[in-house]
């Protein structure tokens, strides 16, 4: 099976060509990864977010992650990123329902893994009950809903669980 090719960019997001994901992470080449935060309101009106627990065979296994994310293959745009939501969570989404928030520049390095990503980041308001999600066990071990305030407090180290 041929390795997946992804588009490679310069630091200003000008397209340069393609490379494999492995090469991009080995050499620190800029590429794109679609991000989507799925949000809703609790019955009491509190803002909430859907978070996933990454699959055991994924990078950063069994850790909490955003609602849905994934690399964009060569030639794909953020519009094509909705495929990740269906592949991971079994949720079919109309791209028109997404709200573009921003494009983040993500830089991370650990040992021989160098990640330089542009992350077009979207918001989706969706109240699908958790039992209706069809999780792909290759990518996702579980999902849960958390109050946004609790997640922010965790990020700010105000709570540890």
Each model region followed by its residue ranges:
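Short loop segments at secondary-structure junctions
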Residues: 12, 40-44, 55, 125-129, ...
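Conserved Nudix-box catalytic region and its N-terminal flanking loop in Nudix hydrolases
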Residues: 23-35, 44-88
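Unchanged
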Residues: 70-161
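Acidic, metal-coordinating catalytic segment for phosphate/diphosphate chemistry
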Residues: 1-44
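Generic, ordered loop/turn and secondary-structure boundary motif
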Residues: 9-10, 17, 31, 61-65, ...
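Short hydrophobic "helix-edge" motifs at membrane interfaces and signal-peptide entry regions
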Residues: 1, 57, 137-138
